[in-house]
Each structure stands twice: as structure tokens, then as C-alpha cells.
Amino acid sequence: MQNFKVDFLTKNCKQIYQRKKHVILGISPFTSKYNESYIRKIIQWANSNFDDFSILLAGEESKNLLECLGYSSSKANQKVRKEIKRQIRFCEDEIIKCNKTITNRIHRFSDFKNNIYYIDIYKTIVDQFNTDSNFKNSCLKMSLQALQSKGKNVNTSIEITDETLEYAAQYVLAELPFFLNANPIINTQETLMAYHAPWELGTNIINDQFNLKMNEKQGYIILTEKGDNYVKSV
């Protein structure tokens, strides 16, 4: 079983981790890190270390990133469907090997468009994006980093404009509810979001730079494979 070094965003995140109730594994599309081997490793780790776990994959908004990199809408949708299908296949196979049920375990952002809890948190985030220039700029910065990273992974590049960044930022905004308070959305009591890198926007949120708060029953952890020193902000 693969061992991971775990870093905590806050002391509260560490306390939630120590109770080992539930973890959400964040899996990014078009990110070389999330190959079949790594996806299997983190599922094994979650199964061994927590009472239960869920998996969060990108939603329809991930096509925005590809469109910003020059793909047509139809081509972007095709690539997203293929990538998500690939990731789901790896996840389902490993979940079964862990003797866990697949039902209600693998989620995408876009699965919750009609979820009242998701809608409420998302609306708060969008309102903040539209009224707080500092928050908006922080989201746009993350969008730029995501475009640069994914541009390398799909072997393409294009001039990035302010309009492009704002369109790409919809991906960031769609993910944020799961960082702030995933519990009512996925029906858990307390949980941690686990990812392979620090999240600068999340750090800014817990440092009270914006009028957004992480719920006390929600945490964020960074997983680093033992002996793997490549981790960086994305």
C-alpha cells in the first residue's frame, strides 16, 4: 500500500484528519499526475486510512479550459468525455478491488447543478466573484496557472486574454463549493478534500482575505508520495 506524506491547511484540518471519517479524492483532468497508477494508489490509501471516501472529478466546466486553449466546443466536449470516462474506469475498478460499492461514490461538479446546497454555496461564490476584485483576480490567477499547465499536457498553446481567463474561471468557481463545505452536498458529517498540491486560492480563503469561510467540518490536505519532492502550487 502506497504511503503518502500528509500536509494540513489548518489545525482544524489536522483534527478532522485524525478522526478519519471521510475523505474526498480530487482528481484533475488532463493532468499527467493522475495516471492509472496514481489513481489506484490514492484510492488504496483512502480505503486504508478512512472509514469512507468519495471521488470528485471535473465537471462540464473543464471543457472551458480546452476551449480557451483553442479547441472547438465539440472537440473540447469530446476530449472531456473521453478523459472522464478513462478516469472513472480506473476508479471503479480499484473501488471494486477494495471491496467497496461504486454507487454514490464517484462525483462530478456538474452532477450537483440541481442540488440546493451546492446551488446556495455556488451563488455566494459567484456573488463574491462579481463584487470583490481581489477574489476575482485570485480566481483568474488560478485559471491562468491551470491553462498553462493543461496547455503543456495537451501540447497546445494560445494567447490568453482577460476574457479567456474569465471563461476558464468557471472551472474554479464550480469546484469551490467542495472546498468550502462539501458535507451537505454529498451527505457527509465531516470531510477532507485531498489533492496533490497546495491551493493558493484556498490558502487565501482561510487567511480571511475574502468574505468566504471554510466550514468547521470541512478540511483540505495535500498528499505527497513518499520520496516525491515535485509538489508545487497549481
Curated annotation (Swiss-Prot):
Signal peptide: none
GO MF annotation list: aminoacyltransferase activity
E.C. designation(s): 2.3.2.22
Site residues (Could be involved in aa-tRNA binding), renumbered to this chain: 79, 89, 171
Family according to the record: Belongs to the CDPS family.
Described purpose of this protein according to its UniProt entry: It uses activated amino acids in the form of aminoacyl-tRNAs (aa-tRNAs) as substrates to catalyze the ATP-independent formation of cyclodipeptides which are intermediates in diketopiperazine (DKP) biosynthetic pathways. Catalyzes the formation of cyclo(L-Leu-L-Leu) (cLL) from L-leucyl-tRNA(Leu). Can incorporate various nonpolar residues, such as L-phenylalanine, L-leucine and L-methionine, into cyclodipeptides.
Descriptive protein name: Cyclo(L-leucyl-L-leucyl) synthase
Originating species: Staphylococcus haemolyticus (strain JCSC1435)
Taxonomic lineage from the root: Bacteria, Bacillati, Bacillota, Bacilli, Bacillales
